[in-house]
Amino acid sequence: FVNEIEDLSNYTKPVALTFDDCFVYFYNNAYPLLKKYNQKASIYIICNYVNGPNYLTTDQIKEMVDSGLVSVQTHTLSHRELTSLSLEEMEKELVESKKYLDSTYNINVDTICYPIGKYNDTIVNKAKEIYKYGLAMTGGVYNSKKHEFMQIGVWLLISLQIIWNSQMLK
């Protein structure tokens, strides 16, 4: 979980396993490996996609939360690019997705993964009111005192590669 590597001085080469969008392939391929190797990961849920075709179901998410191996965090309500939304729409994406996840899964969401990796000062300032962490899909680590809000760069991996690798490890 991202919150478990907050103090990087405790680690020489920390790794956080994160998965965006809540595709069912995570449950079918990655989750069994997490159980097999007793490893933790965070998934970033697009709330409006839960129970949709090719996406995780509420029951699957509850099972993973209950396992203690999967931390559920938000990827907003609809995965719309936040920088293109009005202030009201952006706030709704941030606030309502947390409310939904917190109440549905009896958790405390503290991390947002910005859709499409795009954010600006307005989005970060609003996110700081709601979340402890903000993640973006970037090419490296973002660690700036400018926002005084922990933001972590996430490297994009191709989903098919993850699935292929999971088959090789079985």
Labelled PLM ranges:
Residues 50, 77, 82-85, 157:
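Hydrophobic pocket-lining residues within nucleotide cofactor-binding pockets
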